[in-house]
A protein has these predicted regions:
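Positively charged, low-complexity terminal tracts
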Residues: 2-146
Length: 146
């Protein structure tokens, strides 16, 4: 069952999330960029669920190691991963932003397509009129033609 409120975000994951090669490459590049061009503040790191700016890159890389090994992440851990990749990809202020293509080797067009796919695949933390949660707890698009 999907979690719609913060009380269940720390529930352990039941099984590892199946990711394709493009999703893995994107997540790896995004989490790695917190060690490179991205420049978070302590406030931002904490808001994303990490300890502070200095430890963010190590904590993000530890999450990647777990993803790469096929370990199941909790909903809270997936929330941190998703927020970290959204910010590092899009923000030119604290993330990779305009340097993304150079640091990741991925085009913006390819990256946004992968990111939107991940946003649909990962656990939802808020409701949406565009999506519903099916019986398996996965996000489905209400109207694919929208």
């Amino acid at each position: 069952m999907a979690c719609w409120h913060s009380d269940c975000m720390s529930d352990p994951a039941h099984e590892p999330l199946a990711l394709d090669d493009a999703e893995r490459r994107f997540i790896r590049a995004a989490l790695l960029d917190w060690s490179g061009p991205a420049r978070p503040t302590d406030d931002l790191a904490v808001a994303m669920g990490f300890t502070n700016a200095e430890l963010l890159s190590g904590e993000a890389w530890a999450l990647w190691d777990r993803i790469e090994s096929g370990a199941a992440l909790t909903q809270e851990e997936w929330r941190r991963v998703l927020l970290a990749i959204e910010i590092v990809f899009a923000s030119d202020v604290v993330g990779s932003g305009l340097d993304w293509r150079v640091t990741s080797g991925l085009s913006d067009e390819e990256s946004i397509k992968i990111l939107r796919g991940l946003q649909r695949k990962l656990p939802r933390w808020r409701g949406s009129v565009q999506f519903r949660i099916n019986d398996a707890g996965r996000v489905e698009i209400n109207d694919p033609e929208r």
